[in-house]
């Protein structure tokens, strides 16, 4: 109960635009990626571990043997830049039965993405990258020259593409600016996304899903989108006609169909 209280107190965005994603949303995203025993999942800006624990919750349903439990305990990986959320994430995983959490206090953007090998890649990525932040040239230098965006969320999208296994899956929340930005850097990033990955679904998430934390200046009332990359053809759908919905109704999104 004390831990849950601390998390609720942290439900705000800081100077670099980090959000502590509502549990209903992390659980929804974990469900749609359909975790399997033996898979490895990563969150490169894991905050307090919401996506990681939601993944574990889904995977736990499939644990049948002692070997499955061992795979379960070794299935998650996280990195968090800020010390306090990092400590809370480690505590969170300990409370979920992970004795030696593979979570690190580090900055995911400070390694050259071209140096990642197959051993550095994951079956699944679940993330809500920080948005609204601006990265300096020393961070941007770790990315291909045509994708050196100053925007933090853009660089995390590039990182995900370089650390996702072939035939892997990813569900990622991004701001509208990623979808509609037309500068050369964003175009290069989206070109790689559509050329090298199969974009499965885009789901519009009204700002109310983050209520009451969307009134802060870094958000600006922008809507956000959920990306899921898998090896299926592109489809597009959204809850047409809905102005807003509560966090506990997020599961209904998967069953909604656009009006004619």
Regions found by a protein language model. Give the residues of each.
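A conserved structural/catalytic subdomain of Rossmann-like adenosyl-cofactor enzymes
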Residues: 117-260
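Long recognition/docking surfaces used for binding and targeting
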Residues: 1-10
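Short, flexible segments with low predicted structural confidence
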Residues: 1, 61, 164-165
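Conserved S-adenosyl-L-methionine
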Residues: 18-127, 132-134, 150, 154, ...
